[in-house]
């Protein structure tokens, strides 16, 4: 079957002969062009981090937040079309408020994931709407512990130990997999903050010609009493310093290895001398 739309991408409610919805696939492309966002599930909470590119010197620092508070115990971050992400955040807030008004208790995060997933999936069924060009990572803490989910433009959502989306998702996923392998017992919330900063800095290496701001938030039973809050001040600076030190340390090791190889080659190289040169008793070489 062909990999292009050939007319089957003109409507959101039509499948191609090989069972594909091209409008959803195009929405995924919009997500892949977005800035890198990650989420890490730790021992007693979750940590979110996002790379915010500075597109203009006129932007006010720390004002254009991308990590959002959905409910007191739920946070989210997204990659893709920013207006679509803001709309989903507002819809999520409505769902959380509606649940609390009806049942007199904060919405469980799995129930929140199901409601928001159904809303996103409904936008893949009708000709009068289009899919959301955004992938959302959300999570928090409820009475059953910590939860982390990622919601895709198709409306499907999955629970994760670590999730990444956006342009730098491949390198970010590789680092998250290393974390899971090296820390099977899990991370503390503070350690997860440092690792999240490091992963965002590593993911930014492919786009290093552009400046960016690092934004981090967390929701932890031990650190924030189960509330979703932004990481600021000394802790944020400590995470940034840790990330830069780790990355610069790796670069220094690579340079040392290359220097050692060059030194070894120099030792084995023959010494060129002039045929008319003579050596005195003290070993100095003089040209005749």
Curated annotation (Swiss-Prot):
Residues 269-279 have a biased composition (Low complexity). InterPro entries: Ntn_hydrolases_N, Proteasome_alpha, Proteasome_alpha-type, Proteasome_asu_N, Proteasome_sua/b. Residues 247-288 are annotated as: Disordered. It holds the Pfam family Proteasome. It comes from the Eukaryota. CDD domains: proteasome_alpha_type_3. Residues 249-268 have a biased composition (Acidic residues). One of its GO terms (cellular component) is proteasome core complex, alpha-subunit complex. GO terms for molecular function: mRNA binding. The alpha and beta forms are probably products of the same gene with different post-translational modifications. Keywords: Acetylation, Cytoplasm, Nucleus, Proteasome. The modification N-acetylthreonine is found at residue 2. It is found in: Cytoplasm; Nucleus. Belongs to the peptidase T1A family. The proteasome degrades poly-ubiquitinated proteins in the cytoplasm and in the nucleus. It is essential for the regulated turnover of proteins and for the removal of misfolded proteins. The proteasome is a multicatalytic proteinase complex that is characterized by its ability to cleave peptides with Arg, Phe, Tyr, Leu, and Glu adjacent to the leaving group at neutral or slightly basic pH. It has an ATP-dependent proteolytic activity. The 26S proteasome consists of a 20S proteasome core and two 19S regulatory subunits. The 20S proteasome core is composed of 28 subunits that are arranged in four stacked rings, resulting in a barrel-shaped structure. The two end rings are each formed by seven alpha subunits, and the two central rings are each formed by seven beta subunits. The catalytic chamber with the active sites is on the inside of the barrel. Present with 12000 molecules/cell in log phase SD medium. This is Probable proteasome subunit alpha type-7. It comes from Saccharomyces cerevisiae (strain ATCC 204508 / S288c) (Baker's yeast). The lineage of its organism: Eukaryota, Fungi, Dikarya, Ascomycota, Saccharomycotina.
